[in-house]
Amino acid sequence: MRERVTFIHNDYSLDPEALDNQDAGLLGPQIETVRQDKLTIPFGELPSELTDILQEYEALHIRWASPVKSETMDPFTSRISPGLHVYATPVLPSSCNPTKLCSWLQRFGPLDCSKPEAFTEFQQSTSTSPSFSFYEALEDLHSFITTSSQEFCPELDSVCNARLRSLLTASGLDLSFDKAANALVVSALWPLRPQTVAVPASSARRVEVGIFINDRSQPNMKENELGVAGVLSVLGDQKKPSPTIFTFPARHRRDGSVFTSKFLTPTGLHPTLQLSFNSNKLPSADGECAPYAFLTLPKTIFADRYQLGDELFLASKNLTALRYTTLPVDLEAPAYTTETWGSSILLGLAPPDPGTEKPWSVEIPLHLRYLKPSATGQVEIEIPYPAVFWACSSEEGTLESPFDRLHVGYDYLFPRDTVFWHANPQPENGSRLMNRVTVPVLDDDGVGSIRSGTAIAVAIGFAWVMWKLVSVMLKSDRAPAGVTKETKQKKSH
């Protein structure tokens, strides 16, 4: 087992002499920084309950992002929609039991994933086996922290409990298992804010700590590369932190543009999601770049792929094409009978000519499903902000780095050498990266009368149909007698 803790900051005044590498861990001053904790656990050291589940999967990736806006820095700039995302590739789909996985996932909170139909198939270019995805809105990690503390932390281990509780302020959490690596990688990210440099040592694992600043001054750096400079320390080693400087290719980059997301009013049952950008400036001069929006839509709302197949209609909304959608998507079923979690779509965006920098916007037509009745006749739902980025081609054969982040839902919809420049989401109001929409539903007070009226109407309709059938049968019974009498009269003449 090994652990790597990384601080990325812009405090050029930080003196390495202020870092104290003690037996108990590394201590330092408070600085404004982004922090990532990454723990790699070999398969053989995992709890048996978890290994029983993981052995059924070629790969399993769990991603959570906070709905609260936060700031970050390169290289930790990849974005996903707020909530819990699960991407699973079974070894043998026929023998995989999603109920076991769903049961384990309940430590994050009550999730509606018990049926296989709750998962949707998604594209995974690196595997010949079918892969499946699941999503559910998740406000925080409180339930996960409580359960994990009971399972993994001894009662008197204050360090273990404190580190788990610190996840309450994390902006993201990733759990990744890959059968080829035969290990579970757990990483948590804390946003840019004042934090004290404090990392406890451990006798059970090797702990490395890196404290870096972004450094673009290094010679021979390429456009798609990032550089960092700082110090690296191995806890338990009484040596002073070692100076370190290096460059690496970056798959995810931070773009300078900002976007907001809101539903145009009035919404009705067919709301339009508007994405507004402060700039149409290209993020990179190297390679071809195009902007995209990757939407995660819960079962209460969906996009009509047939409507988004009309090129003239798309052009009027500053869209280019529906590049991808998960399936199936039932276009008629109400939310309370829909078994799948929802759907994901990738939309190409059409910005103005980059020759003149200016703000711009796109409009995405969506459709609400019918919801259950409520006492007020209205139900409020939330839709997570999409991940919005420029996808730019590069000439690099690989973009792998110590800080690389894969399996975020949209990365495998592009070539492996694609660089993603992420636009920064800005809440329309408050600090939450969620769009609220009010859905008109049936009033609870009117349900009884509507049901009675429907029953009466059905009964009357049934009686009318039966009366018509009986009338036709009676007429058909009399007709042959009249015809016979008329035939006999003709023969007598």
Swiss-Prot record:
Glycosylation site positions: N318, N429
SMART domains, A to Z: PIG-X (SM00780)
Single GO MF annotation: mannosyltransferase activity
Topological category with respect to the lipid bilayer: Single-pass type III membrane protein
Coiled-coil regions, chain positions: none
UniProt entry keywords in alphabetical sequence: Endoplasmic reticulum, Glycoprotein, GPI-anchor biosynthesis, Membrane, Transmembrane, Transmembrane helix
Residues in the Lumenal compartment per record: 1-453
GO CC entries: endoplasmic reticulum membrane; glycosylphosphatidylinositol-mannosyltransferase I complex
Cellular localization per UniProt: Endoplasmic reticulum membrane
UniProt pathway: Glycolipid biosynthesis; glycosylphosphatidylinositol-anchor biosynthesis
Predominant place of localization: endoplasmic reticulum
InterPro entries reported for this sequence: Pbn1, PIG-X/PBN1
Family, per entry: Belongs to the PIGX family.
Official protein name in the record: Protein PBN1
